[in-house]
A protein has these predicted regions:
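Hydrophobic alpha-helical segments within soluble ligand-binding/sensing domains
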Residues: 1-6, 111-132
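An alpha-beta-alpha
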Residues: 1-37, 137-153
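Periplasmic-binding protein-like
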Residues: 10-13, 42, 64-75, 94-96
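Solvent-exposed loop/turn segments at secondary-structure junctions
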Residues: 15-20, 48-51, 72-76, 98-102
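Structural motif
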Residues: 45-60
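Glycine-rich, charge-decorated loop segments at or immediately adjacent to ligand/cofactor-binding or catalytic sites
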Residues: 52-54, 101-110
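Venus flytrap/periplasmic-binding-protein-like
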Residues: 78, 82-106
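Hinge/cleft segment of the Venus flytrap/periplasmic-binding protein
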Residues: 126-187
Protein backbone atom coordinates (compact mmCIF):
# COMPACT_ATOMS: atom_id res chain seq x y z
CA UNK A 1 0.00 0.00 0.00
CA UNK A 2 1.02 3.60 -0.31
CA UNK A 3 0.25 6.46 1.95
CA UNK A 4 -0.79 9.71 0.36
CA UNK A 5 -0.77 12.55 2.81
CA UNK A 6 -2.58 15.78 2.17
CA UNK A 7 -1.50 18.91 3.97
CA UNK A 8 -4.97 20.37 3.47
CA UNK A 9 -7.82 17.90 3.54
CA UNK A 10 -7.18 14.36 2.34
CA UNK A 11 -4.58 11.66 2.81
CA UNK A 12 -4.99 8.27 1.26
CA UNK A 13 -3.49 4.84 1.64
CA UNK A 14 -3.82 2.75 -1.48
CA UNK A 15 -2.71 -0.73 -2.44
CA UNK A 16 0.94 -0.58 -3.45
CA UNK A 17 0.82 -2.52 -6.70
CA UNK A 18 1.34 -0.87 -10.07
CA UNK A 19 -2.29 -1.15 -11.18
CA UNK A 20 -3.70 0.57 -8.11
CA UNK A 21 -1.06 3.29 -8.06
CA UNK A 22 -1.72 3.82 -11.77
CA UNK A 23 -5.45 4.17 -11.06
CA UNK A 24 -4.79 6.52 -8.17
CA UNK A 25 -2.83 8.87 -10.40
CA UNK A 26 -5.01 8.39 -13.50
CA UNK A 27 -7.40 11.01 -14.86
CA UNK A 28 -10.15 9.45 -12.75
CA UNK A 29 -7.85 9.04 -9.76
CA UNK A 30 -7.64 10.97 -6.54
CA UNK A 31 -4.11 12.21 -7.27
CA UNK A 32 -5.42 14.18 -10.22
CA UNK A 33 -8.29 15.48 -8.10
CA UNK A 34 -5.93 16.57 -5.33
CA UNK A 35 -3.64 18.26 -7.84
CA UNK A 36 -6.57 20.00 -9.53
CA UNK A 37 -7.87 21.27 -6.20
CA UNK A 38 -4.41 22.49 -5.20
CA UNK A 39 -4.24 20.11 -2.25
CA UNK A 40 -0.68 19.23 -1.32
CA UNK A 41 0.12 15.61 -0.50
CA UNK A 42 3.10 13.34 0.03
CA UNK A 43 3.48 9.57 -0.21
CA UNK A 44 4.66 6.92 2.24
CA UNK A 45 4.91 3.18 1.63
CA UNK A 46 4.62 0.04 3.73
CA UNK A 47 3.79 -3.61 3.19
CA UNK A 48 3.89 -4.94 6.77
CA UNK A 49 2.37 -3.86 10.07
CA UNK A 50 5.76 -2.52 11.19
CA UNK A 51 6.10 -0.48 7.99
CA UNK A 52 2.54 0.82 8.34
CA UNK A 53 3.37 1.95 11.89
CA UNK A 54 6.48 3.74 10.60
CA UNK A 55 4.42 5.36 7.85
CA UNK A 56 1.87 6.53 10.44
CA UNK A 57 4.72 8.00 12.49
CA UNK A 58 5.97 9.80 9.38
CA UNK A 59 2.49 11.18 8.69
CA UNK A 60 2.32 12.56 12.20
CA UNK A 61 5.80 14.06 11.83
CA UNK A 62 4.72 15.61 8.50
CA UNK A 63 1.90 17.38 10.35
CA UNK A 64 -0.83 16.34 7.91
CA UNK A 65 -4.33 17.66 8.51
CA UNK A 66 -6.21 14.42 7.76
CA UNK A 67 -5.76 10.81 6.71
CA UNK A 68 -7.95 8.74 4.38
CA UNK A 69 -7.43 5.00 4.07
CA UNK A 70 -9.47 3.05 1.53
CA UNK A 71 -10.25 -0.55 2.38
CA UNK A 72 -6.94 -2.44 2.49
CA UNK A 73 -6.12 -5.60 4.44
CA UNK A 74 -2.57 -4.49 5.27
CA UNK A 75 -3.86 -1.29 6.85
CA UNK A 76 -6.72 -3.12 8.55
CA UNK A 77 -4.25 -5.52 10.16
CA UNK A 78 -2.26 -2.57 11.50
CA UNK A 79 -5.20 -0.31 12.45
CA UNK A 80 -5.26 -1.15 16.16
CA UNK A 81 -1.56 -0.25 16.34
CA UNK A 82 -1.82 3.12 14.54
CA UNK A 83 -5.12 4.79 15.39
CA UNK A 84 -3.92 6.21 18.72
CA UNK A 85 -0.97 7.88 16.97
CA UNK A 86 -3.44 9.89 14.89
CA UNK A 87 -5.65 10.71 17.88
CA UNK A 88 -2.67 11.87 19.95
CA UNK A 89 -1.59 14.11 17.04
CA UNK A 90 -5.11 15.48 16.52
CA UNK A 91 -5.32 14.01 13.01
CA UNK A 92 -8.71 12.58 11.96
CA UNK A 93 -8.45 9.31 10.04
CA UNK A 94 -11.20 8.73 7.49
CA UNK A 95 -11.51 5.22 6.09
CA UNK A 96 -13.29 3.16 3.46
CA UNK A 97 -15.10 0.74 5.78
CA UNK A 98 -16.85 0.61 9.15
CA UNK A 99 -14.42 -2.03 10.43
CA UNK A 100 -11.67 0.60 10.49
CA UNK A 101 -13.82 2.81 12.75
CA UNK A 102 -14.42 -0.23 14.93
CA UNK A 103 -10.64 -0.54 15.27
CA UNK A 104 -10.17 3.13 16.21
CA UNK A 105 -10.29 5.27 13.07
CA UNK A 106 -12.42 8.42 13.35
CA UNK A 107 -14.86 7.63 10.51
CA UNK A 108 -15.50 4.60 8.34
CA UNK A 109 -17.49 5.48 5.25
CA UNK A 110 -18.72 2.68 3.07
CA UNK A 111 -21.50 0.98 1.25
CA UNK A 112 -24.94 1.01 2.81
CA UNK A 113 -25.21 -2.79 2.74
CA UNK A 114 -28.91 -2.82 3.64
CA UNK A 115 -29.67 -0.58 0.66
CA UNK A 116 -27.34 -2.64 -1.56
CA UNK A 117 -28.94 -5.90 -0.43
CA UNK A 118 -32.45 -4.61 -1.14
CA UNK A 119 -31.51 -3.41 -4.63
CA UNK A 120 -29.72 -6.70 -5.37
CA UNK A 121 -32.75 -8.69 -4.19
CA UNK A 122 -35.02 -6.57 -6.40
CA UNK A 123 -32.81 -7.26 -9.43
CA UNK A 124 -32.71 -11.01 -8.73
CA UNK A 125 -36.48 -11.12 -8.23
CA UNK A 126 -36.96 -9.30 -11.54
CA UNK A 127 -34.80 -11.90 -13.30
CA UNK A 128 -36.33 -14.95 -11.59
CA UNK A 129 -39.97 -13.88 -11.42
CA UNK A 130 -40.39 -11.51 -14.35
CA UNK A 131 -38.02 -13.22 -16.80
CA UNK A 132 -35.80 -10.14 -17.07
CA UNK A 133 -32.71 -10.77 -19.19
CA UNK A 134 -29.55 -10.76 -17.00
CA UNK A 135 -27.48 -9.66 -20.01
CA UNK A 136 -29.52 -6.49 -20.38
CA UNK A 137 -30.06 -5.81 -16.68
CA UNK A 138 -28.42 -2.47 -15.99
CA UNK A 139 -25.54 -2.10 -13.58
CA UNK A 140 -26.56 -0.05 -10.57
CA UNK A 141 -24.32 2.25 -8.56
CA UNK A 142 -24.86 4.10 -5.32
CA UNK A 143 -23.72 7.65 -4.67
CA UNK A 144 -24.21 7.50 -0.92
CA UNK A 145 -23.28 5.21 1.91
CA UNK A 146 -23.12 4.78 5.65
CA UNK A 147 -20.74 6.66 7.91
CA UNK A 148 -19.65 4.95 11.11
CA UNK A 149 -18.17 7.37 13.65
CA UNK A 150 -15.99 6.10 16.49
CA UNK A 151 -17.29 8.08 19.45
CA UNK A 152 -14.15 7.54 21.55
CA UNK A 153 -11.94 8.79 18.74
CA UNK A 154 -14.25 11.74 18.10
CA UNK A 155 -13.92 12.70 21.76
CA UNK A 156 -10.15 12.13 21.67
CA UNK A 157 -9.90 14.54 18.74
CA UNK A 158 -11.95 17.11 20.65
CA UNK A 159 -14.81 16.96 18.16
CA UNK A 160 -18.46 17.37 19.10
CA UNK A 161 -20.31 14.25 17.95
CA UNK A 162 -23.54 16.12 17.20
CA UNK A 163 -21.64 18.55 14.97
CA UNK A 164 -19.95 15.63 13.22
CA UNK A 165 -23.34 14.00 12.56
CA UNK A 166 -25.01 17.20 11.34
CA UNK A 167 -26.07 17.23 7.67
CA UNK A 168 -24.31 14.03 6.61
CA UNK A 169 -23.82 13.29 2.92
CA UNK A 170 -24.82 9.67 3.43
CA UNK A 171 -27.88 7.59 4.19
CA UNK A 172 -27.09 7.26 7.88
CA UNK A 173 -24.50 7.87 10.58
CA UNK A 174 -23.80 5.04 13.03
CA UNK A 175 -21.87 5.33 16.28
CA UNK A 176 -19.31 2.77 17.46
CA UNK A 177 -16.59 2.40 20.09
CA UNK A 178 -13.14 0.88 19.65
CA UNK A 179 -13.00 -2.92 19.77
CA UNK A 180 -11.18 -5.78 18.06
CA UNK A 181 -14.34 -7.19 16.48
CA UNK A 182 -18.01 -6.34 16.06
CA UNK A 183 -18.80 -9.20 18.47
CA UNK A 184 -16.93 -7.28 21.20
CA UNK A 185 -19.20 -4.22 20.90
CA UNK A 186 -22.09 -4.10 23.37
CA UNK A 187 -25.40 -3.83 21.60
Amino acid sequence: WRAVIADSVVMSLVQGNEIDIENFTSEEGKGVYLDKEGIEYVERTGTTTDEVQLAADALVADGVDAVFTPTDNTIMTAELSIYEKFIDAGIPQYTGADSFALNGAFVGYGVDYANLGQKTADMIADILMNDADPATTSVETFDNGTATVNTETSEGLGLDLETVKKEPLCTQVNEIVTAESFDDVEK
